[in-house]
Amino acid sequence: MKKRLCAVLLASPLLFSAAVFADDAQQLRDKLIGTASLKADFKQTVTDVNKKVIQTGSGIFALAYPNQFYWHLTQPDESQIVADGKDLWIYNPFAEEVVIMDFAEAINASPIALLVHRDDATWSQYSVTKQQDCYEIKPKAIDSGILSVKVCFKNAQLANFNVADDKGNLSQFDLSNQQAITDKDKALFSFVLPDNVDVDDQRRKTAH
């Protein structure tokens, strides 16, 4: 009887921790669902392992359910990422190249795509820990260069997020001028292929 009681006491902290993490994940999902759509300006600051600023930038960020995402870095070098709900388009104007991927591959590449994803099976691959008004998302199996994503809210509104990679770099994104997506803004999630660019189509050929 004593051995059984001891085993229960030892297991209790583990069960409690799992329940807390599950609650944290659900809280984050509820907050994101409450943010059905969002458009904002962003400022980007990247620091290296020594906390030295190695890059700054700015641009426009937008998201909408389901699986729609828009990222336009305007300074210092332009780049664009668009998820239309099915495919992911990555455009590098300087290189005159467009890469096309399945949206599922974006999820695999970075937890940041969870901001617009509701699939239970996908969320189960990540652990979520609440830290005051922030939530840290970590992949349970590290198979990409992204170690964690932290998203922070202010007055129930997404305020900033950061991405930590396996090289010790931290990319911080601070949002401003947040507003809901308008009918006009919905065009942001439809990528128009520019003329005279190289196209690297990495989508599953069986699906297209």
UniProtKB/Swiss-Prot annotation:
This protein's UniProt keywords: Chaperone, Periplasm, Protein transport, Signal, Transport
PANTHER family for this protein: OUTER-MEMBRANE LIPOPROTEIN CARRIER PROTEIN (PTHR35869:SF1)
Family: Belongs to the LolA family.
Signal peptide: 1-22
Pfam families in alphabetical order: LolA
Organism: Shewanella baltica (strain OS155 / ATCC BAA-1091)
Location of the protein in the cell: Periplasm
Function: Participates in the translocation of lipoproteins from the inner membrane to the outer membrane. Only forms a complex with a lipoprotein if the residue after the N-terminal Cys is not an aspartate (The Asp acts as a targeting signal to indicate that the lipoprotein should stay in the inner membrane).
Protein name: Outer-membrane lipoprotein carrier protein
Gene Ontology biological process terms in this record: lipoprotein localization to outer membrane; lipoprotein transport
Domain of life: Bacteria
GO CC annotation, single: outer membrane-bounded periplasmic space
Major subcellular location class: periplasm
SUBUNIT field: Monomer.
